[in-house]
């Protein structure tokens, strides 16, 4: 029915590839493309005999627009699923524009030399995508992605007005290493060492990194420390959820992770600025990435569960109301199914679902969109079908926040 070009061959890409191959009625053909073709060939070798989806592979440098254009013109995909690096989003969008190919990603663009991510660069493509008659679906991972769909679903079915949204991202997994990141180390460490922020009463409130803390008792996981971070979906939800008064994002971290991160930051290893070493320039955080375990290798050794969702407060039929919509994912179950830990799984499954929404016409219209701008119902049904079942808890525990240094 459709041809998908999947750009990337890391942990999330592996999940997208597996799920597209499970969904061969929709994805009849896929091309896996990466800078390192041998990684793509490995996926093909593993899966081709287990699926009706026809798999091809290609080498491509996602920083090189002419290379991307040449590949798209040769393969003629209906959709491009971008699970490469966020630095490469705009290059891939440029190629999609030139070749009139629909586009889906899981994380918004950020410049490689600055630890700052926001949607303005991709939203600026809206008119060009409209004129080209193609769809760009931004942020169809879990957070951003499913969390935005949860917001649209809550707005449609549970509230007349949503007043507050707290997005909670809990990883209760244990990989056994003193320090490792569950997705791209460079992206992860840049994100958590940056200033935090939240949306309140129509404007941004900025915080110091890890300044605000909470402890939350997560269903099926238990009590975890969590910290307020800046996260990209706050920006789009503030625009797309009318009347919302406050949006915050929290992520859980263990003490070992925070101690290691602070030490690395103190000695300059999280810097994005190049330094001279033995006659060549290196970027400290990129060098650190080379030393840390590859997130794709964590699957077999990670145990425990994730709990990711949104706590909403608001009004329905004149009465105050609160709910928690969430998913729980088991690391070992994910590994049994697609040889991945749950962090990659919870990002890769929604990327496939978002792409399916576009190619089947359910979420297809010209322009650049965030997930919460579409009807959430078919996406929510697909989550249950494809491995990320969700639950709704009425009157959940609400989040209480304090300054981390006041513990």
Label for each model-derived stretch:
Residues 107-135:
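Rossmann-fold NAD(P)-binding glycine/threonine-rich loop
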Residues 156-407:
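C-terminal catalytic/substrate-binding lobe primarily of soluble NAD(P)-dependent oxidoreductases
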Residues 36-39:
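Helix N-cap at the beta1-alpha1 junction of Rossmann-like dinucleotide-binding domains, i.e.
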Residues 4-11:
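Conserved N-terminal Rossmann-fold NAD(P)-binding element of oxidoreductases
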Residues 13-17:
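N-terminal Rossmann-fold NAD(P) dinucleotide-binding loop
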Residues 61-77, 88:
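Conserved Rossmann-fold cofactor-binding substructure of NAD(P)-dependent oxidoreductases
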Residues 83-86, 95-118:
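ADP-ribose/adenylate-binding Rossmann-like module
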Residues 49-64:
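Rossmann-fold cofactor-recognition segment
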